[in-house]
């Protein structure tokens, strides 16, 4: 029988009490040492999990060394956020096993997933099925994933895809504006998606300020993902201040 894994249970239990904040680290952009420091800092500030991955598909020792450094520096769950089937590390706690539902290319809907499935099973990583939706502008992930980005002013399209994802068995829905996007996902879109689905809703991309994080949470996001704003802070101390600011917007 299928059983929900430890990390997914952790997410659901925490969501009964508060909204969650996940920090995304891209192994292409951060060294293992920096990743470890950010993870340690994140745990002290009250972040709930660390996601590791990126659009350009860091893999192998580059990925493994970052995951190991995070595991050695904090007790937060480490969840893989792979750009392809190569983005799997045996050292992670879980993987967002996601389908890019609005891709034009079936490889990103089911093909890459099929290629990675046995690796996930062999490593014993907890898979968490997730519907992944790219919202305009989409940035690098939209280009790499050959997505047809959902227009920002068409929340009903996002809601239809999100509900389809839930009905297909996905246990999370992620609305993604793209790392470093000039604007985050519109609150109106978040609100409509939240209204029609019953599974947790993740929102990421373009969230740089406490106010933007708060607006997303107030609109209905259950989990906020930040990354670029922290990675590009310029120093560890600046990263700490940015993390504290963003976290205060989520934990309202």
Curated annotation (Swiss-Prot):
This is Geranylgeranylglyceryl phosphate synthase. It is found in: Cytoplasm. It comes from Thermococcus gammatolerans (strain DSM 15229 / JCM 11827 / EJ3). It catalyses: sn-glycerol 1-phosphate + (2E,6E,10E)-geranylgeranyl diphosphate = sn-3-O-(geranylgeranyl)glycerol 1-phosphate + diphosphate. GO terms for biological process: glycerophospholipid biosynthetic process. The lineage of its organism: Archaea, Methanobacteriati, Methanobacteriota, Thermococci, Thermococcales. It is an enzyme of class 2 (transferase). InterPro entries: GGGP/HepGP_synthase_sf, GGGP_HepGP_synthase, GGGP_synth, IGPS_HisA/HisF. Its main location: cytoplasm. It comes from the Archaea. GO terms for molecular function: imidazoleglycerol-phosphate synthase activity; magnesium ion binding; phosphoglycerol geranylgeranyltransferase activity.
């Amino acid at each position: 029988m299928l059983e929900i894994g430890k990390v997914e249970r952790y997410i659901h239990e925490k969501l009964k009490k508060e909204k969650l904040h996940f920090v995304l680290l891209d192994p292409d952009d951060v060294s293992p040492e920096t990743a470890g420091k950010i993870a340690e800092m994140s745990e002290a500030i009250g972040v709930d999990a660390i996601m590791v991955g990126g659009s350009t598909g860091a893999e192998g020792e580059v990925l493994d060394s970052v995951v190991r450094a995070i595991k050695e520096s904090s007790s937060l769950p480490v969840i893989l956020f792979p750009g392809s089937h190569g983005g799997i590390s045996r050292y992670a706690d879980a993987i967002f096993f996601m389908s890019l539902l609005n891709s034009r290319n079936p490889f990103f809907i089911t093909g890459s997933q099929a290629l990675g499935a046995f690796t996930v099973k062999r490593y014993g990583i907890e898979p968490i099925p997730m519907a992944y939706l790219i919202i305009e502008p989409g940035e690098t992930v939209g280009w790499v994933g050959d997505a047809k980005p959902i227009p920002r002013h068409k929340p009903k399209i996002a809601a239809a895809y999100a509900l389809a994802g839930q009905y297909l068995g996905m246990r999370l829905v992620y609305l993604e504006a793209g790392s470093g996007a000039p604007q985050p996902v519109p609150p109106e879109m978040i609100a409509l998606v939240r209204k029609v689905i019953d599974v947790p809703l993740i929102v990421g991309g373009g969230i740089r300020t406490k106010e933007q994080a708060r607006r997303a949470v107030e609109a209905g996001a259950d989990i906020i993902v930040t990354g670029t704003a922290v990675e590009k802070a310029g120093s560890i101390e600046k990263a700490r201040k940015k993390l504290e600011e963003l976290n205060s917007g989520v934990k309202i």
